[in-house]
C-alpha cells in the first residue's frame, strides 16, 4: 500500500515539541560520561539568519547528535554576540533603542534556529548584552587589571570617521573600517589596552600544539604575531646635519646582511627626530599630517602609496664613516613597530625598491642568485628576495646571507659607539597590545572611575555591574554616554569626592573572547565555575568562518591564558579542534542593470541553454556569476522560505551534501528539490515496509540476499561514522544515498509481502541502522521513520535523539573475497575474484580457468605462476 506523503511542516513541529518537552538536549554538568563540547561561533543578532548560518549550525548539530549517540555527555549551547555598532546605527536610522532592536532580532533568530531542529541546550542561552553577562565581564576586567594585564596609555589609534570610534588593527581591512568601509585615520588618544604582548611567545609556541586546526589559520596567526630575530643598529648622524640633542638613529632590521646595499634610512612621522625637524618646517608638517590620514595597521601601510620626505639629514654607514645615507620621513614606517626607523635596501625588498625608484636612489644588489654572474647581474622592477651568495659587500663577499647576518652582528656588537655597542641582537614581535576602548554606547561599560585627586581606579566589586543607562539619545554620531546628564557623574571610591565614570565601552571582540567559558556554568555568580570550566574546556570542536582566523581566534587564545593567570580556568588553549566551513553561494541575476532576486525569476532550458526571465513580465534576465549571498546583490535565499517549502531536514541535507564542508556550496533550487525528493524517498520506503517489519526482531542475515543487505548496512555504519569523525559530511551523505539505493529493492519486496523471515530480520536491522545514521543530518525524518517502525531500537522504546549509534559487526565489514590483478609476462591483463583465504594452489588453478589466460597460453602450459599473497598474480608464459 502506498504511504501517505511525508509532511515536514507537521512532523518537524511535532518532534521539536517532543524534544523540548523532554528537555532532550539539556546537559547535566554532573554526568559522569566522557565529555564532548561542540560549539559553533555564536551569531550577531542582525535580524534574520541566512543560509550560511544554516550550514554552520547544521554541521555542528551533526557532530553533537553523533557524539551523543556515541555515548558522550555533549555540551552544545547557543547564545548571541549582541553588542556592537549596527544596533546604534539602527537606533539613529529607525528611532528604536539598541536594546529593543537587539532583543527583537534575537527573538526572530531564535525562532528560526529552533525551526532547524538543532540539538541545542537552550537552558544555557545568554546574550552578551544581558546585564548578567557583562557584569561578569566587568569582574574579569578588574581581575585582569589587578594582575597587570590591563593598561591605559596614549597611542596612535585607527579612527573610523563614519562610526566615530576606534578600531583595532585587525578591524582595519585594506585601510578601511571593517564595518563602515570608511577610510581609516590616525589619531592620538588615551586608550585601555589588554597586554596581549605579554603572551606573544606563548601564543606563537601554542600554535604547534593545535594539530586539529587548519594549517592556513595557524599560519595566519603565526604571521600576525610576527616573531622576527634581527639586529638593532645605531646609525650615527653626520655632523652638521642634525638638530641639537640628536646624535643617532636606531634602526631595527631583520636583514643586516644587506647593509652594504643600503640606500636610505626612513623614520616614522611620529619619530622624535621627525617631530623636532617639523618645528618651523611647514612642508614637513604638512607631510606628517598626510601620514596621519592613513590607518595604523600594516595592511594600511602595504596598500598605501609609498611616500617620503627628504629631511636633508644624513647618517653614517656603520662600516664606513665616509659613506652617508639620506634620512627620509616615510609614510610606511610606524613608531610602534621596532624602533620607528628602518634602513632601505632596494635590491632585496620590493617596498624599498619602489621607494628608491620613486626618489631616484641608488640600487646595489648584494645577494647574487645561484647560477648568475656577478658582473652582469642587476635589479629591474622586481627586488630579489631569495637566497644566494653575498656580493658587493666587502668582507661579506662569498658568504651566505645567514653567515653574513651573523658576521655583521658579531662585528657591530663589538664596535663601540659613544660608550655602547653599535648593535644588539633583538627579538621583535609584530603583535601589539589590544586596544579595547570604543567611543560608543552599545557595549560593555569599562568599570573604571577617574578622580582628579586619586587618579584612575576600578569600580568596587560591590558596586558592579556598571549598567548602561536606557535614557540616551541617538540624534547624532558619537558616544551618547559622553553626553548623558547624570550617568557619568559618580563619587570616587577612595576619597568620596566628585569623579566621573569611564565613558568608553569595550570592543565587542572582548565579549566573544570568553563566552565559551561562560557556557560551562552560565548561572554562576563568578565569571566561571572553576570545576565546570576545567571539566568542559577546551572546546573539543569549534566551527566557524575563516574570516575570524586572526581577530576572534587570537583574542580568545589570549583571553584563556589571561583567565588562567586570574584563576578562572586551568587551560591555555580554548579550542582543541577548529573547522572553518565554506560559504553558501548563489548565482546572481540582473534585469535592466538592476540586481534581481532568484525568487522573482524563472529559469528554463531552451535549446540546451539555461535561460532566465522575470516571473511577472517575462522580460529577459542576465545570469551572472556565482557569488557569496548578499542583500546588495539580492542573491539571498531566506531559510524561512526553504523550511516552509521543503522542511528543515531538506535544507540541512542539501547544505551538507553538495560539496566538501570546507569549500563553498552553491545553492540551487534544483539541488533543494533533489534533496527533498530523497527525503520523500526514504519516508516512502520505510513507511511502506513498516507494516511488515514493525513487529520483527532485528537480526543480521547469514546467507543470500539477506546477508548482502546486512553487509551493505554494516559497511555503511562504519564508513558514515568515520566520515562524521573526519567532518567529511558530504562523503557520509553520499554513502547514505548509495545505501538507500542498495536497500530499496529489498524494502519494496517486504512492502509487497515477498520477504522471508531471514530477510525481514535483516531488513528490520538495516532500516533501524539507516534511520539512526540519517538522524544527525535529518533528525525529524529519522524520528518519524522510527515511530512508523514502532518507536523501538533493538527492541527498546526510545527517541532517535537518545538512541545509541548503531554498532557494526566486523565480520560483516570485512570482505570475504578479494580482487587480484593478473599479469601475463609482467603486463596486467585482467582480474581474479577469489576467496580471501584461498591457498596458493587454488589461486593458480583459478587463474588457469580465466579466458584471457587460456587465450594467452594458446593450449600450452605456463612456465610458472607467481602468487604474491593478497596482492597480485603473474603468469609467465
Curated annotation (Swiss-Prot):
Motif ('HIGH' region): 43-53
Motif 'KMSKS' region per UniProt: ranges: 628-632
Keyword field contains ATP-binding: yes
Binding residues annotated for ATP, in chain numbering: 631
UniProt-annotated location(s): Cytoplasm
InterPro entries for the chain: aa-tRNA-synth_I_CS (IPR001412), aa-tRNA-synth_Ia (IPR002300), Leu-tRNA-ligase (IPR002302), Leu_tRNA-synth_edit (IPR025709), M/V/L/I-tRNA-synth_anticd-bd (IPR013155), Methionyl/Leucyl_tRNA_Synth (IPR015413), Rossmann-like_a/b/a_fold (IPR014729), tRNAsynth_Ia_anticodon-bd (IPR009080)
Pfam families membership: Anticodon_1 (PF08264), tRNA-synt_1 (PF00133), tRNA-synt_1_2 (PF13603), tRNA-synt_1g (PF09334)
Catalytic activity: tRNA(Leu) + L-leucine + ATP = L-leucyl-tRNA(Leu) + AMP + diphosphate
Keywords, sorted A to Z: Aminoacyl-tRNA synthetase, ATP-binding, Cytoplasm, Ligase, Nucleotide-binding, Protein biosynthesis
GO biological process terms held by the UniProt record: leucyl-tRNA aminoacylation
EC number: 6.1.1.4
Single annotated GO MF: aminoacyl-tRNA deacylase activity
GO CC, alphabetical: cytosol
Family: Belongs to the class-I aminoacyl-tRNA synthetase family.
Protein name stated in the entry: Leucine--tRNA ligase
Species in which this protein is naturally found: Brucella abortus biovar 1 (strain 9-941)
Encoding gene per record: leuS
